[in-house]
Design a protein with these regions (language model features):
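Glycine-rich beta-alpha loop elements in corrinoid/cobalamin-binding modules
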Residues: 1-45
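Generic detector of ordered secondary-structure context
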Residues: 21, 45-46, 97, 135
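Walker A/P-loop phosphate-binding element recognition
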Residues: 44-47, 74
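Radical SAM [4Fe-4S] cluster-binding motif and immediate context
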Residues: 51-216, 226-228
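Catalytic palm subdomain of template-directed nucleic-acid polymerases
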Residues: 231
Length: 232
């Protein structure tokens, strides 16, 4: 969308603006031309240095949304190394995982905790495979510090990674019962998994984790998707 706006602002002749824009190839956009053909442009270029993107919290853009109805969300990383065909993030364009720096995340957590209304207890983390990386362990330490200082967040909403479960359990232990361990399978049918290009953690590995999960008192949940290719 920002690419379209930028192209519009570059137009000097407003009377011909619509016609000129419809004949352009604008990155990350599909445009219907004046001749009714579609122009497919190059995919969007992903920023490698995520900290170049201004923080919507630290710049004050999110202040009006601390309204007692919405849960704050932060993002520590972008990208996903997996290629599940049902997922928009399974594209080759986003397989590289990039992270925001820990200093920025620490400031965002402090900023949110100081402003979140008393009736809001949940913090969302919109990473695709939270707990799979070393930086996530450090982030959990920061969140634990914020919890001790502000008694927030009492609950975390995260999507934990489907592999490296032992590492994820170490991460989850730092946050106690504030977070649940997600062990999504999407399907247990091997032919369906092949169709959607997904490799689940093996059943043997899953069962090996059971004693550790019970000992730690972790809450768990799973997810399945109905109607995947080959389901019926």
């Amino acid at each position: 969308f920002s690419n379209i706006v930028e192209s519009i602002l570059q137009e000097k002749d407003r009377t011909e603006m619509r016609k000129n824009i419809s004949e352009k190839y604008i990155d990350a956009c599909i445009i219907k031309g004046s001749d009714d053909t579609f122009h497919f442009a190059a995919p969007a270029k992903r920023p490698r240095e995520l900290d170049e993107i201004p923080s919507p919290y630290l710049t004050g853009l999110m202040d009006k949304f601390f309204d007692g109805r919405l849960d704050p969300y932060i993002q520590a990383s972008r990208g996903c190394p997996f290629k599940c065909t049902y997922c928009v993030d399974g594209s080759d364009l986003v397989t590289k995982v990039n992270r925001f720096c820990q200093g920025r995340l620490s400031k965002e957590l402090e900023y949110i905790a100081k402003r979140v209304p008393k009736n809001i207890h949940t913090l969302g983390i919109s990473d695709l495979n939270f707990g799979s990386y070393k930086g996530d362990l450090e982030l959990c330490d920061m969140i634990a510090g914020i919890q001790k200082k502000y008694e927030y967040p009492r609950a975390l909403y995260v999507q934990t990674g489907k592999n490296s479960k032992n590492n994820i359990i170490k991460v989850m232990k730092k946050l106690g019962d504030a977070v649940k361990l997600t062990m999504s399978v999407q399907s247990m049918d091997k032919s369906v998994l092949k169709n959607i290009k997904r490799d689940n953690i093996s059943e043997e590995q899953m069962m090996e984790l059971k004693p550790t999960i019970e000992e730690s008192g972790l809450q768990t949940r799973t997810e399945v998707i109905l109607g995947l290719p080959g389901d019926s």
